[in-house]
């Protein structure tokens, strides 16, 4: 459900002007006149006082809920929160943090950011902001972020507790633009094989990906794995720019068409950086929207193959209609189609958003994630790629060329319960904080860490013990063994993230990621 909400939040924005003139039918007995009279009557005559703004907002939401599952209304606050992760930057102090024991723990200061420049380091605890205590007072994460963020150029005083130093430290931090990156990882996964993982499609995504491509080519990249697993989408323009890097000038990337929106085509504007080397795109059931555009374009143009599982199936174009108060309607105006003519949008019932939200759950129960044969495709859904005329299928989402089943034995019920109670993340953060100095001293080179580091059994046993306090116990010895095995991998990845960065986190995970390993096998053996 959380993944579905994320996909809805980052559903890409069609680059269509929201200021287009709309003809509204006015006059006696018109629907808009009836709606206006109803609002006036309720506001002025209803027995109790009425919040007029909320009344109108609820009416807008009510109308949109009767349409498709991706048309929706957002308040000004919600709109800002939704756009920020995709807009490339925000104003703040520049730290990655987590809350541990009701205290803000700095995971990493942003490189060359305001906090790093004044000397704040990983492991510092921020206990007060401008003399207001934020530690041990049960302040919400949202309220803490409000205090830390502010306009560029303004200053904030931070009170810091640092391990090994008795007295509290005071830092004056001048807020600045903090970059928001969308690329999770880029590295050479094998000799000659580069790997790029993109988390979403934002304003800076194209630049991030092209810089990574150029860097990996210098390191000897001949083939590329482009990982779009869990990528919920983002901006259409970013998707078109990135797809362009795999195609030749003039190649069709995607087209949109709707009742009031004539067909609009998006084509490669130039020869791409990676138009000749092999490419494998990775997808799963949480790959959506803009990520499906890129996957579909590469597949339909026969530039590469798709490995993984069927994607989410979000193929509706939204136009943002912005009100003066900053709130917005995201109104579906068209479908988008891959170059072969496939509509990516999966079927839905108008007005039944709960059914739509439960679609992935139904697909899981039907066996789609574990058994390729559970997906029955009729001949009416057949399409053909544009160059090699391979069969591909429509009907919702992008079907992979090579199916990789979900390993359901990895994730035990016990582990899910431990994670839900935040026991895993809290214990890992405490461990890293206590051993950060020795870990950095012992593992100056990440490759040595990847090859030799083993998570202490005491850390895993401590997590199991904390779970027992919350009445979380395995059903049998087999579940306990599998839970410990998975914890060892997860904790190693978390240590790598906190000592280095997200790229190293995924390097640890990818050694056991079946979809990634299938792509490596395909590129190294050809089958």
Model-derived regions, located:
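Residue-level recognition of conserved beta-strand edge/terminus positions
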Residues: 129-130, 161, 347, 395
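Extended, small/polar residue-biased N-terminal targeting/export presequences
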Residues: 46-107, 153-185, 509-520, 527
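Hydrophobic beta-strand signal
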Residues: 127-128, 254, 305, 330, ...
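Conserved functional hotspot residues or short segments at active or partner-binding sites
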Residues: 343-344, 348-527
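Structural motif
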Residues: 123-125
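Bacterial Sec-dependent N-terminal signal peptides
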Residues: 1-28
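Cleft-lining beta-strand/loop regions that shape enzyme active-site pockets
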Residues: 20-31, 35-52, 75, 105-108, ...
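Flexible, acidic/glycine-enriched loop-and-adjacent beta/alpha segments
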Residues: 305-337, 350-364, 370-377
